[in-house]
């Protein structure tokens, strides 16, 4: 493996190196959700989910799509999805293999 690939792999693991972030990513392997839906599914506070989602979007592992525009009374509502299928495959594969260790 070349140096650039090792750096990319390091950045990937650095990004998922948080228990709640990893829970959110695994949740997103099962479908696309709003932050409120993720918070409900994982029994987490929406602000905590939102903070982690912003981080994951900034790292380009998760994408956010506006489904309801911001108004005077409410923030915009987004649906969150894993950026690509390969990340989903990696997460599912890691989860399956971890029990064999």
Where are each of the predicted segments found?
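Residues within the DNA-recognition helix of helix-turn-helix
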Residues: 52
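Short alpha-helical segments that sit at the start of domains
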Residues: 1-22
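Beta-hairpin "wing" of winged helix-turn-helix
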Residues: 59-74
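Key DNA-contact positions within bacterial/archaeal DNA-binding proteins
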Residues: 47
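Short capping segments at the starts of secondary-structure elements
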Residues: 19, 30-37
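A short acidic, leucine-rich amphipathic alpha-helix
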Residues: 37-41, 56
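Conserved segment of winged-helix/HTH DNA-binding domains
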Residues: 70-101
């Amino acid at each position: 493996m070349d140096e650039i690939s090792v750096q990319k792999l390091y950045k990937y693991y650095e990004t998922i190196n948080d228990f709640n972030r990893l829970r959110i990513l695994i949740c997103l392997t099962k479908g696309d959700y709003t932050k409120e839906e993720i918070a409900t599914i994982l029994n987490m506070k929406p602000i905590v989910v939102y903070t982690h989602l912003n981080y994951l979007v900034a790292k380009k592992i998760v994408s956010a799509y506006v489904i309801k525009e911001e108004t005077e009374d409410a923030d915009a509502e987004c649906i969150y999805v894993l950026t690509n299928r390969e990340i989903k495959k990696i997460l599912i594969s890691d989860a399956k293999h971890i029990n064999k260790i």
